[in-house]
């Protein structure tokens, strides 16, 4: 027991020491793995979709497979090599060009007479999506601003802005935008997504409509046996003829014409009234009252 005049000894706190050991104070932080810190909602969404452990991620993957199957089955000729050359003339004349191997689309804006060389281009993409082409040929005139590479990534759009045509090895700015689906019809006609609301094209209205074959209808309709022509010949029953007599108006009968004779259903202690006859009710008023007895 400490004396009243001396202070109590300070007890050693183990909780603070444990917290300092966990944090490490910068010395043991490398040995403690706290995991990856995710603060962006987009990273959380992409990670959940890639796990395939919940119902939403499975539906997302199935939807991607259905979209790819729909594009391939409904437009198989669009993604062939011959159709790419056919759609090339419908592209805008500012440097857009389609790829044949990877089914990509590159689009470049060239400055004064810049022409893409064979070694590199403004929108060239190889097997790796992060590969960027560099190096331009000698300055020319009338060349496209961007040229598609041989093995481009599917569903990519490359934007290139080369330097001047005199510079042999100029570095261009490459921006890659990944899209899941680009309609080849919108791409060929040059329709912007904002103009889809205003522009309505009915492709079925332009083609010649073939005459439909005249098949026999087997619907269950009330048709006589053999058709109407044979049934009219076999019909022997005829409706009998009869003369209609003159129409006579029926007399209007009114019951209880005198409304005063109608009974009243009010909740009053009034007896029923007869049909207009006077009725006298005899009520005995002088009823003898019996006196009280001794028992009461």
UniProtKB/Swiss-Prot annotation:
Residues 105-117, 134-170 have a biased composition (Gly residues). Expressed primarily in skeletal muscle and specifically enriched in the gastrocnemius, which is composed predominantly of fast-twitch muscle fibers. Detected at lower levels in heart. GO terms for cellular component: actin cytoskeleton; nucleus; pseudopodium; Z disc. Keywords: Cell projection, Nucleus, Phosphoprotein. GO terms for biological process: negative regulation of calcineurin-NFAT signaling cascade; negative regulation of skeletal muscle tissue regeneration; negative regulation of transcription by RNA polymerase II; sarcomere organization; skeletal muscle fiber adaptation; skeletal muscle tissue development; wound healing. It is found in: Nucleus; Cell projection, Pseudopodium. Residues 105-172 are annotated as: Disordered. The modification Phosphoserine is found at residue 82. The keyword Nucleus applies. It comes from the Eukaryota. One of its GO terms (molecular function) is protein serine/threonine phosphatase inhibitor activity. Belongs to the myozenin family. Interacts with ACTN2, ACTN3, FLNA, FLNB, FLNC, LDB3, PPP3CA and TCAP. Interacts via its C-terminal region with MYOT. Myozenins may serve as intracellular binding proteins involved in linking Z-disk proteins such as alpha-actinin, gamma-filamin, TCAP/telethonin, LDB3/ZASP and localizing calcineurin signaling to the sarcomere. Plays an important role in the modulation of calcineurin signaling. May play a role in myofibrillogenesis. This is Myozenin-1. It comes from Mus musculus (Mouse). The lineage of its organism: Eukaryota, Metazoa, Chordata, Craniata, Vertebrata.
